[in-house]
Structure formats: structure tokens, C-alpha cells
């Protein structure tokens, strides 16, 4: 009954818009529907990725085999660290593009994404600390420093983006003089290098293949 009522109301609104607004109104409605579908699809993809990580965590919590728990924890850390690097790469690109093109909407989107990512990362970190408590004690002592270094690195990436974004928003929002073209020309190759570095770091962490780590560190 509720679904039928909602469908009737939507149909009535669309017919009204078509009657009074004609083709332009219908075009706007179609654009709005397309935006909603794309946005919902993006959110669904993000939720599915988080659910995959949560499934891995549930397996980790249920496991009573310390060797299996360690293997699951490694997989969990690889996924979460890879997710943070993917987020960092995308957000860094949005911030720099927003600054270069004076796009305030793009900068605001990056600001909201950073706040969301802070909450997501805190949940991941708490879960992985639980995992560290379930593995063999001596192994936990051995890996503890490296684990927290990885956590702190991910945290610093997120907060580094926030600190970088703040002056960019201030610059664009206050209508300061746009960046000169020669500054932009100098910035673009640097952005490309950072983008390649983050993608290569993500690939190495998620696959566990660090053969090219030295080459990446010197780029």
C-alpha cells in the first residue's frame, strides 16, 4: 500500500512538472534521477567493500587457531591499508584539482570525504587491535611496533590531507587571486608523481610484493 501510494505521488509530480515545465523540467528530472542512481551506486560499492572487511574480521574473531588468526589479521591489515591509500590518492587528486580549477564544490566534497574516512579508519584500527590480542603473544610483541607504525602512517595520511585542504578552501572561498598558470604547470608533474607513488604503494601492500620498494622510495 505504501509503495503504491509513493508511486502515485511521484507519478503525479512528474506529470505536473511535464505539464507546467515541459521539456526543460523533464530534462532536469532525468538529470536528478541519474545523479541519485550514480550516488546510490557509489555508496553501495563503498558499503560492499566495508562489508567484505567486516566479514574478514568476523572470521578472525571466531578463529581459535592462532596461526589462522595471524593470517586473517594480515589480510585485514592489507585491505584496510590499501583502502586508506586508495582514499588518499583520490582525495589528493580532488584537492589539487579543486585548487587549480577554483572548484569549491570539489573541495567541499573532499572535506566531507575526509571526515567520513576518519570514522571508518578508527573502526578499522580498533578491530585490528582486537586481532593483535588474539595472535600468539611472542608474535604480537615482535610485530607490535610495525603494526602501530602502519596505523600511525595511515592516520597521518588522513590528517595530512585535512591540513592540506584547509588553506586550499580558504584560498578559493575567499576569492583570492587564482594560481598563475606557471604555478599550475609546475604543480601538475608533482601531482602525477604523488599519484603514481600512492598507487604503487597500494599495489605492494595489497599484494605483499615489495620487490620494487627501493625504486619507489627514490621516486
Each predicted region: which residue ranges?
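Hydrophobic core of alpha-helical transmembrane segments in multi-pass integral membrane proteins
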Residues: 28-39
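Cytosolic, long alpha-helical scaffolding segments
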Residues: 41-218
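Composition- and surface-driven signal marking solvent-exposed, interaction-prone regions
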Residues: 25-30, 109-110
Amino acid at each position: 500500500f505504501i509503495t503504491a501510494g509513493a508511486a502515485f505521488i511521484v507519478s503525479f509530480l512528474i506529470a505536473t512538472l511535464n505539464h507546467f515545465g515541459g521539456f526543460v523540467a523533464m530534462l532536469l528530472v532525468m538529470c536528478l534521477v541519474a545523479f541519485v542512481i550514480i550516488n546510490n551506486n557509489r555508496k553501495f560499492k563503498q558499503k560492499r567493500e566495508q562489508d567484505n572487511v567486516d566479514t574478514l574480521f568476523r572470521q578472525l574473531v571466531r578463529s581459535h587457531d592462532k596461526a589462522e588468526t595471524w593470517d586473517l589479521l594480515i589480510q585485514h591489515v592489507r585491505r584496510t591499508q590499501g583502502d586508506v591509500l586508495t582514499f588518499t590518492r583520490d582525495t589528493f587528486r580532488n584537492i589539487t584539482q579543486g585548487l587549480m580549477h577554483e572548484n569549491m564544490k570539489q573541495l567541499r566534497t573532499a572535506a566531507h570525504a575526509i571526515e567520513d574516512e576518519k570514522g571508518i579508519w578508527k573502526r578499522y584500527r580498533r578491530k585490528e587491535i582486537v586481532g593483535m590480542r588474539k595472535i600468539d603473544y611472542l608474535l604480537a610483541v615482535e610485530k607490535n611496533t610495525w603494526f602501530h607504525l602502519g596505523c600511525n602512517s595511515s592516520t597521518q595520511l588522513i590528517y595530512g590531507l585535512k591540513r592540506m585542504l584547509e588553506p586550499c578552501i580558504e584560498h578559493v572561498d575567499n576569492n583570492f587571486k587564482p594560481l598563475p598558470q606557471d604555478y599550475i604547470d609546475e604543480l601538475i608533474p608533482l601531482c602525477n608523481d604523488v599519484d603514481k607513488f600512492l598507487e604503487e604503494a597500494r599495489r605492494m601492500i595489497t599484494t605483499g610484493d615489495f620487490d620494487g620498494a627501493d625504486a619507489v622510495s627514490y621516486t
